[in-house]
C-alpha cells in the first residue's frame, strides 16, 4: 500500500497528483508478477475541511463505494451495498466497540458538498484493510456512493498492489 497525503499541503492547487508511474516502472523492471493492482482517490466530504489542521481533529476521509468494494474484493471480502443517499463507515481494527458506538450515535448524518447522506442500516465495517486509507489521527473512513464522490475534493491518492508471490 502506498498513499499520498494532503496533510502537509496548504493550498488545494498544490495537492499531489501522481499516477505512481515510478512504482509501475519498478514492478516492470523487476518482473514482479501482480495478482491485483488498484489506484483510487479519497475525498474530503466538505472542501471547507481542507484547512482543518488541528492534531487529533483531522476530518475523516471518504472513499467511493466502487473503490471500497474493489479493496474488499482484493482482500477476499464480500462487497457491500449502499443506497444513493446513504453512507457507511470502515473502522481501524484498534478502534474500541464503545468508541465506534458513541461515534455512530452522534454521526447519523454526513454533510457533504454534494448533499446530506444518512447512515446506512448496515453501517459499520472493521475488516483489516491496511493503514493507508485513514486520515492522520483518525480511525474511520466514510464509504459513500460513487455519484457523491465525483463531486468532492480528492485529497489523497492510494495504490494497493498485491503480488502473485511473496517478495
Regions found by a protein language model. Name each.
Residues 2-167:
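Basic-flanked hydrophobic alpha-helices used for secretion and membrane insertion
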Amino acid at each position: 500500500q502506498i498513499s499520498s497525503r494532503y496533510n502537509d499541503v496548504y493550498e488545494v492547487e498544490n495537492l499531489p497528483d501522481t499516477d505512481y508511474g515510478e512504482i509501475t516502472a519498478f514492478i516492470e523492471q523487476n518482473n514482479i508478477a501482480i495478482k491485483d493492482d488498484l489506484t483510487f482517490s479519497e475525498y474530503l466530504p466538505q472542501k471547507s475541511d481542507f484547512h482543518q489542521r488541528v492534531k487529533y481533529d483531522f476530518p475523516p476521509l471518504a472513499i467511493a463505494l466502487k473503490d471500497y468494494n474493489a479493496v474488499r474484493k482484493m482482500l477476499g471480502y464480500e462487497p457491500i451495498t449502499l443506497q444513493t443517499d446513504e453512507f457507511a463507515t470502515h473502522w481501524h481494527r484498534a478502534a474500541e466497540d464503545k468508541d465506534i458506538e458513541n461515534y455512530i450515535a452522534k454521526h447519523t448524518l454526513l454533510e457533504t458538498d454534494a448533499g446530506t447522506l444518512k447512515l446506512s442500516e448496515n453501517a459499520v465495517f472493521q475488516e483489516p484493510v491496511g493503514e493507508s486509507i485513514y486520515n492522520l489521527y483518525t480511525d474511520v473512513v466514510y464509504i459513500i456512493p460513487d455519484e457523491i464522490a465525483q463531486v468532492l475534493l480528492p485529497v489523497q491518492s492510494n495504490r494497493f498492489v498485491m503480488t502473485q508471490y511473496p517478495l
